[in-house]
Design a protein with these regions (language model features):
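Positively charged n-region of N-terminal signal peptides that target proteins for export
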Residues: 1-4
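Bacterial N-terminal signal peptides
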Residues: 7-16
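Boundary at the C-terminal end of the N-terminal hydrophobic targeting segment
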Residues: 17-21
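Short N-terminal segments immediately surrounding and downstream of signal-peptide cleavage
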Residues: 22-40
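Short, P/G- and charge-enriched loop/turn segments at secondary-structure junctions
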Residues: 25-27, 42-43, 128-133
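Extracellular/periplasmic catalytic domains that process cell-envelope and extracellular macromolecules
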Residues: 30-31, 48-50, 57, 78-79, ...
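Short beta-strand segments
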Residues: 34-68, 84-86, 95-97
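Short, structured beta-strand-loop surface elements
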Residues: 72-142, 146-148
Length: 148
């Protein structure tokens, strides 16, 4: 009786590990050095849209962006089209597929703003207030991309 239970437990753990896709070490290095990612969100046809350059930060193996709720990436996520292709550094750079989700997490929003201040010191001074106020008022939303 113990062997079937053990075999089922091992299989379940393997399936859970596969479901928790992670960034490769190479992509993690590329992301650490990149200033921008280029996100292509899923259209109604199932194809990906045009790549859109955006600031980002990575935390816990997930990629986060702060954006306006009127952006195509947000509209498509709200419509249930959560697949995205994310290119690192340039539209032709190394890429991965991810699943997008809207999240409301003040701790992650704070981490994002601290990361942006450090990573984008020249541009952040112009945008800091709109991000901080925007997250509070809903004029900015947090999108989390989980690698597939």
């Amino acid at each position: 009786m113990r062997r079937p239970v053990l075999a089922c437990s091992v299989l379940l753990l393997a399936l859970l590990a596969a479901a928790q896709a992670a960034l490769t070490p190479e992509l993690s290095r590329e992301l650490a050095d990149a200033q921008y990612v280029y996100i292509q969100s899923e259209r109604k046809t199932g194809d990906f849209g045009k790549p859109s350059e955006i600031w980002f930060f990575v935390d816990g193996g997930k990629l986060y962006v702060g954006t306006r709720p009127s952006s195509w990436r947000v509209k498509r996520i709200k419509a249930g089209r959560t697949r995205a292709r994310i290119a690192v550094g340039s539209p032709q750079g190394p890429s991965f597929e991810a699943t997008g989700a809207l999240v409301k997490d003040p701790k992650i929003e704070e981490k994002l703003m601290r990361a942006y201040a450090k990573k984008y010191p020249d541009g952040w001074a112009r945008h800091a207030a709109s991000f901080k106020d925007g997250f509070r008022t809903g004029e900015r939303v947090l999108v989390m991309y989980t690698p597939r």
